[in-house]
Amino acid sequence: MGPVAPGDSVIFLVGNFAAQHNGAVITCDSAVRYSDMRIEFFGNVLINKNTTYIYGDRAEYNGEVNEARVFSDIVKVVDEDATLYTYEFLFNTKENVGEFGGGGVLVNRDSRLESVRGYYYANSKELVCVDRVEMRNDEY
């Protein structure tokens, strides 16, 4: 998460932990608080804002730039009937915009959309896929 600034304290939070910023709630098994605006989350990480749910093993949150970077073997982003699977997901809790790189798969009903990179706009429920985009649907 980076160096600890002089004067900052580091607090280890063991046991179910929750934090809130910009209307997003982040829960996990344990956390390390580096400052008022920098927290690292471990184990069963869940970020929830409105209808968006982001699941991972670990997350780093920087409140100064309103960004949560979520890591896992498979990060899962669920918004109603659509689910995105990727390896790393960056979510801005103020703008409600996420992005992924390194590959992602969106599953929605009978469709499957794959791309190397993408941007997710939670307010409008839109996914913009970039770089080697492929869609699969039995009807097309």
Specify the residue positions occupied by each region the protein language model found.
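N-terminal amphipathic/hydrophobic interface segments
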Residues: 1-140
